[in-house]
Swiss-Prot record:
Pfam families: NLE, WD40
Protein name: Ribosome biogenesis protein wdr12
Lineage: Eukaryota, Metazoa, Chordata, Craniata, Vertebrata
Name of the coding gene: wdr12
Renumbered residue ranges of the record's region Ubiquitin-like (UBL) domain: 4-87
GO molecular function, one term: ribonucleoprotein complex binding
Organism of derivation: Xenopus tropicalis
Length: 423
């Protein structure tokens, strides 16, 4: 049997083995290598309990016999191959299931609470244990997106966007558990599908079916903006006196030729937007101009940006998740495609604490946990939903969240190994 010379290394001090080459069978797979490392650790420490390990060669997870991986990566069998090993991530476990009255379109998790938006026209605030704390009513059509603005000792500001063409700025008094509509943000001429708050927590942007992006103040005030009503807007849906003071946008960004499906802030003065026109645009907020365009060949449904890896992830109707470097001179080149979903990818979210990991949801009813060092297959499929997955998110408390057209919000307990924590 052909042998390969390999040197094993790890960042995890307690699992380190001697830094010398070992001769191993070329056909070795994960289980074989894991057994070898455990035997070496047992020799060093008789009390060692077997651990499941994962292995990386040239920063890519081993998912096939070693020799096949080396051939795929163009690694010579004549040299000593460097193999990194990390403790295998355990599968996320479904923890809570929170029922809604209609589809769960959007989720925003924090350390303490979960905010959801639903097609039943309401938003809900949940405890991490799955208890409803507050139901927020006011929108006249389905809620499409929700997000937290800021939190202080007694209250939180939050936003909701709706098919009713408005965005609501709410104040939630956490001490008394009371909600107040502060501002009704008006100016879009179509469903508002995506909202995102900037790092200063003083501004937010929105993307709509009217093909426009708009930037708004997120700071509450006692002043009402003047808003000119368009004649084709149905008057029976106006309940502005109950919805807080009217607010109009600071600026409108025009450039997409189809609906804007997803928006985010990638820097203090930079916004990314994804559209049904097959393009992702990166905007300079100061000048209101497009800095660059990442062109696809199918509809983009969602984008997510990781400040840790400085990479953009996109999900499309062609079932693929693509990773981009928006700052590269060749920004339009896809770094990697994650291909496993069998339906439209509806939602992607980078982990807030692990630069290699992201989660995705799809019309195929599955939530998938990915590590970008394994582009060919997800780490895990989470198959809790009985219908389409519409939204995914993370909390800082180690939960993955997903909502779908089965009217359910699921939370999954997830603990990553220390070696995967991003800088």
């Amino acid at each position: 049997m052909a042998q390969i010379q390999a040197r094993f290394f790890t960042e995890e001090e307690k699992y380190k083995v001697d830094d010398v080459p070992f001769s191993i069978p070329a056909t070795s797979e994960i289980v074989d290598l894991s057994n070898l490392i455990n035997k070496l650790l047992e020799t060093k420490n008789g009390d060692h309990k077997p651990v499941e390990f994962d292995f990386l060669v040239k920063s890519q997870f081993l998912r096939m016999p070693l020799i096949k991986h080396m051939e795929a990566e163009g690694i010579s069998t004549e040299v000593v191959v460097e193999i990194e090993y990390v403790e295998k991530i355990t599968a996320p476990q479904p923890e809570e299931c929170m029922m809604h009255d209609d589809w769960v379109s959007s989720i925003a998790g924090t350390e303490e609470w979960i905010l959801t938006g639903s097609y039943d026209k309401t938003c809900r605030i949940w405890s991490l244990e799955g208890k409803t704390i507050m139901t927020i009513t006011g929108h006249t059509e389905a809620v499409k997106d929700v997000t937290w603005v800021k939190k202080d000792s007694l209250s939180c500001l939050l936003l909701s966007a709706s098919i009713d063409q408005t965005i609501q700025l709410w104040e939630w008094n956490t001490e008394r558990n009371k909600i107040k509509a502060l501002h009704c943000c008006r100016g879009h001429a179509g469903s508002v599908d995506s909202i995102a708050v900037d790092a200063s927590r003083t501004k937010f942007c929105s993307g709509s079916w009217d093909k426009m992006l708009k930037i708004w103040s997120a700071v509450p005030s006692e002043e009402e903006d003047e808003y000119e009503e368009t004649s084709d807007r149905p008057r029976k849906k106006q309940k502005t006196e109950k919805m807080g003071l009217t607010r109009i946008p600071i600026v409108t960004l025009s450039g997409h030729s189809e609906a804007v499906s997803s928006v985010l802030w990638s820097d203090v003065d930079e916004i990314c937007s994804a559209s049904w026109d097959h393009n992702i645009k990166i905007w300079d907020v100061e000048t209101g101009t497009v800095k660059s365009t990442l062109a696809g060949n199918k509809v983009f449904n969602c984008i997510s940006y990781s400040p840790l890896s400085q990479r953009l992830a996109s999900g499309s109707t062609d079932r693929h998740i693509r990773l981009w470097d928006p700052r590269s001179k060749d920004g339009s080149l896809v770094l990697c495609s994650l291909t496993s979903h069998t339906g439209w990818v509806t939602s992607v979210k980078w982990s807030p604490s692990h630069e290699q990991q992201l989660v995705s949801g799809s019309l195929d009813k599955l939530v998938k946990l990915w590590d970008t060092r394994s582009c060919k297959a997800p780490l895990y499929d989470l198959a809790a939903h009985s219908d389409k997955v519409l939204s995914v998110d993370w909390t800082d408390a180690g939960l993955i969240l997903s909502g779908g057209s089965d009217n359910k919000l699921y939370s999954y307990r997830y603990t990553a190994s220390l070696s995967d924590v991003g800088a």
